[in-house]
Amino acid sequence: MKILMINVVCGIRSTGRICTDLATALEAQGHEVKIAYGREKVPEQFKKYAVKIGSDWDVKVHGVKARLLDGAGFGSKKATKQFVKWMKEYDPDVIHLHNLHGYYINIEVLFDYLKCSGKKVIWTLHDCWAFTGHSAYCDAVKCERWSKGCYKCPQIKEYPKSFIDRSKQNWKKKKTIFSGVSDMTIITPSHWLAGLTRVSAQFLGR
């Protein structure tokens, strides 16, 4: 089986190490694994798995868009289109998503492909970003606006920090973008995050 993981980093930090640990275990079981990543260096022993999405310059431009326009996840359109072209050629059996924030991938372009691909999709959520209009860790300020619709984000100055607040628009866009994938399983590393995910508008009932 061919398995493709997508994460902001590969082989470093918590989520990057989770991906490479999974890749090593899956490879030992006879599967073929690739990890598409967006930024930073990959340790030598994990380069056999690594597929770079876009360029370092693209990450910087995406970061500027996020800072100026609260556009985290909505930059990197050209890079993501090129990556989707590569995915079609690679033709994985399973696509395992991890952190999609980090200024490296366009969620609209990615999910347009996932919705029409017919692929089995697994998404491991490592934080709250997927179901909020801005924040990655909404629980830090005990905010529950995300459950019905974000607005006036109390964490707009926190990662992914922005000069303006488009949390209301982002929340609505994410709800639309993340709906409609026919075969998608959501995984969380904790009961706490699972509880939040189940009642979120983006993943209600999954």
How should these model regions be labeled?
Residues 1-206:
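Catalytic cores of nucleotide-sugar-dependent glycosyltransferases that transfer UDP/GDP/TDP-activated
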